[in-house]
């Protein structure tokens, strides 16, 4: 068995096999275009790849690899993100996925990575057997309160590429004091935003939408929100505010709610740090996040147990 980068026919085979699980309502052709378009972004060309465990030319298991940077306890570390771990049905139960993950972690260690990170949709037990440890994170359901005395007094505009450097700065402010947070460059932000926009654009008309808005002062973004609407409901994918109270973010959501008053209060859900609580919203409930965040050290001395309440990881970055 050997670990190889999946391209050409192997990549085509993997995309065909994984489509029934992760097709997201796309056609099979659109699903393949979605992955390839992510790879074609500036960040994706060098930091997103697909890998396969092969024997005799046969794909035994496959996974995506994301080359990430993160901050933990004031240190910047390299992190190997692992996603879409898949074994063809006829080959399951033989330990191929275990061997693949071990090989990816060993390769990450050789490349200087300190941690491997994944998000499990199948519970924690399986990946705990592979040496991962769950980091409990939560998702909040939030009701946006109506503005008082008419329309909210904040001006917003659609966000675009020119805003990403400023948003990267807002993200850097948000991670101060975090027990674990990604280092989010402008190129990385362009990648994760493109991933959502491509999914909406390649899917059936009207199934999904992506809303990206900023508030600016002196031609610089001082707050932003990214909201998606679709089969998973209204998701507050990402947000940031130069004001620690989050009042601008709250006011921006009030503006979005005011566009459709007949629909009633705007309700969104997302991974929101408990310390971030704008006065314009009310937390309806808090539940464990559906995708379980899990870490595994790539080297023996690098065990990491970040305080869950201090993890900063927006929904937009989950893979």
Model-predicted regions and their roles:
Residues 72, 77-91:
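Mobile, glycine- and charge-enriched loop segments
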Residues 106-120, 261-272:
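Conserved GNAT acetyl-CoA-binding A-motif
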Residues 50-52, 58-68, 81, 86, ...:
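Conserved beta-strand in the GNAT
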């Amino acid at each position: 068995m050997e670990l190889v980068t999946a391209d050409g026919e192997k990549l085509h085979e993997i995309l065909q096999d994984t489509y029934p699980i992760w097709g997201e309502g796309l056609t099979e052709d659109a699903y393949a275009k979605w992955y390839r378009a992510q790879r074609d972004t500036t960040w994706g060309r060098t930091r997103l790849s697909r890998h396969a465990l092969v024997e005799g030319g046969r794909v035994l298991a496959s996974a995506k690899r994301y080359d990430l940077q993160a901050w933990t306890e004031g240190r910047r570390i390299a992190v190997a993100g692992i996603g879409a771990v898949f074994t063809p049905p006829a080959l399951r139960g033989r330990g191929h996925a275990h061997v693949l993950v071990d090989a990816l972690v060993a390769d990450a260690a050789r490349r200087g990575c300190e941690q491997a990170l994944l998000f499990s949709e199948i519970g924690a037990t399986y990946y705990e057997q592979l040496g991962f440890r769950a980091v409990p994170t939560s998702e909040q359901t939030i009701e946006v309160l109506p503005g008082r005395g008419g329309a909210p007094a904040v001006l917003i505009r659609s966000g675009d590429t020119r805003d990403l450097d400023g948003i990267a700065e807002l993200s850097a402010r948000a991670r101060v004091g975090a027990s674990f947070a990604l280092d989010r460059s402008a190129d990385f932000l362009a990648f994760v935003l493109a991933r959502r926009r491509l999914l909406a654009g390649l899917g059936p008309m009207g199934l999904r939408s992506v809303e990206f808005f900023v508030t600016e002062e002196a031609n610089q973004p001082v707050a932003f929100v990214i909201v998606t609407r679709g089969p998973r409901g209204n998701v507050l994918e990402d947000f940031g505010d130069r004001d620690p109270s989050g009042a601008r973010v709250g006011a921006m959501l009030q503006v979005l709610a005011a566009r459709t008053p007949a629909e009633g209060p705007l309700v969104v859900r997302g991974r929101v740090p408990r310390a971030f609580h704008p006065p314009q919203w009310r937390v309806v409930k808090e539940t464990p996040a559906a995708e379980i965040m899990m870490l595994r050290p790539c080297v023996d001395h690098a065990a990491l147990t970040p305080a869950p309440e201090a993890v900063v990881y927006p929904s937009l970055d989950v893979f």
